[in-house]
Amino acid sequence: MLDFLNPNIQKLIEKRRWKEQNKFERLKGIYKFVRDDILFGYNVDDNIAASKVLEDGYGQCNTKGTLFMALLRACEIPCRIHGFMINKQLQKGAMSRFVYKNAPQKIFHSWVEVYFEDKWYELEAFILDRKYLSKLQKNLQIATDFFVVMAWR
């Protein structure tokens, strides 16, 4: 799944010049790319290769996490994944009624940790692109305080 040697993934890394940047700028650039350039949406399956997520141009927690990890590993940033089951009610409103109705009661949710400056950091806020998050906040009329936005130094 983490097919970071895929030519399209390698071309993206070269185009963005991530390997030329220091580790922090590399991490930040990859994070922002996955968050904002890969839109929020449901792929055909959770078990698809990172290159397929890149080709689709969209993903959700599990598939965006796959792409995020592939890009990190290709750029020599250690990472790992965690996951657990959540009740589908937590995703109500984030998926169409048809998808929600047909989804299993328990859904697998994952997030990625990166190793930076001798510590592991949990990074999960890349799931919703900024445009989708803004619309969701507006439509649900909820405070922005409820959503963590990664503050880069």
Regions found by a protein language model. Give the residues of each.
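Secondary-structure boundary elements
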Residues: M1-D56
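Residue-level signal for well-ordered alpha-helical scaffold segments within enzymatic catalytic domains
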Residues: K32-D36, A70, A74, S110, ...
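A general marker of short, structured functional hotspots
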Residues: L27-G29, K64, S96, E117
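His-Asp-centered catalytic microenvironments across diverse enzyme cores
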Residues: F4, I86-R153
